[in-house]
Amino acid sequence: MDDAPAGYRDPSGRHGAVTLTARPEPIAFDTDATALIVVDMQNAYATKGGYLDLAGFDVSATGPVIERIARAVAAARAAGIRVIWFQNGWDPDYVEAGGPGSPNWHKSNALKTMRRRPEMNERLLAKGTWDYALVDALRPEPGDIVLGKPRYSGFYNTPLDSMLRARGIRTLVFTGIATNVCVESTLRDGYHREYFGVVLADATHQAGPPSLQEGALRNIETFFGWVSDVAAFEAALQPDEARRIPA
């Protein structure tokens, strides 16, 4: 029992059929009880001229992250794992963003950037804009779930929890931006709702210096979940025959 991987166990004690190499230990899951979460891969967060770039954050390294997310999505779809896409933002009038009575009004760097630089005439993170849209290289397909969210966590004021429970999903595999903000916030909230959370580290990117990426991943693997990578995810989802090494 002590040598068994981490992960959800059914009432009979059976763990999942797929074992993923991860830190701090391997974690097992069943593909039909797992979702791949793609967090906020919008122009706002991953493209020059988007919100993060305009707010002074470095987005120059997001290209390889987008490519690895595409690989993770392809592997998940091939294995029958549900793909869930999040888009962070608000209505065009910013009612959902909250006014001065909301901490979001004071802490959101998008809202602060627009107030500080009104001459830009930007509509950052507003639904229906280029900023809000997913990057061209990543597109949902039929069968995927696309959800908007008005705050960092994908569980806040969204139907995510009920959608997951209705489908018997217990394990959430995370990719996206930003590791230290929306990815970690959603994984933490999932942890408190009894979901097993895994981050594919090389398919995420931080908002801020690299030390924030390192700190977020260390925090997750120590307290809230597991950390793996795209190559390990792809390998774990290969049929047994494909994983065997010829003698």
UniProtKB/Swiss-Prot annotation:
Function text: Hydrolyzes ureidoacrylate to form aminoacrylate and carbamate. The carbamate hydrolyzes spontaneously, thereby releasing one of the nitrogen atoms of the pyrimidine ring as ammonia and one of its carbon atoms as CO2.
SUPFAM superfamilies: Isochorismatase-like hydrolases (SSF52499)
GO molecular function terms noted in the UniProt entry: hydrolase activity, acting on carbon-nitrogen (but not peptide) bonds, in linear amides
InterPro entries, per the entry: Isochorismatase-like_dom (IPR000868), Isochorismatase-like_hydrls (IPR050272), Isochorismatase-like_sf (IPR036380), RutB (IPR019916)
Family label: Belongs to the isochorismatase family. RutB subfamily.
One GO process term, biological-process aspect: uracil catabolic process
Classification via CDD domains: cysteine_hydrolases (cd00431)
Catalysis performed (reactions): (Z)-3-ureidoacrylate + H2O + H(+) = (Z)-3-aminoacrylate + NH4(+) + CO2; (Z)-3-ureidoacrylate + H2O = (Z)-3-aminoacrylate + carbamate + H(+); (Z)-2-methylureidoacrylate + H2O + H(+) = (Z)-2-methylaminoacrylate + NH4(+) + CO2
Pfam families assigned: Isochorismatase
Gene that specifies this protein: rutB
EC number: 3.5.1.110
Matches recorded under NCBIfam families: RutB
Active site location: 40 (proton acceptor), 149, 182 (nucleophile)
Naturally occurring in which organism (per UniProt): Methylorubrum populi (strain ATCC BAA-705 / NCIMB 13946 / BJ001) (Methylobacterium populi)
Protein name: Ureidoacrylate amidohydrolase RutB
Keywords per UniProt: Hydrolase
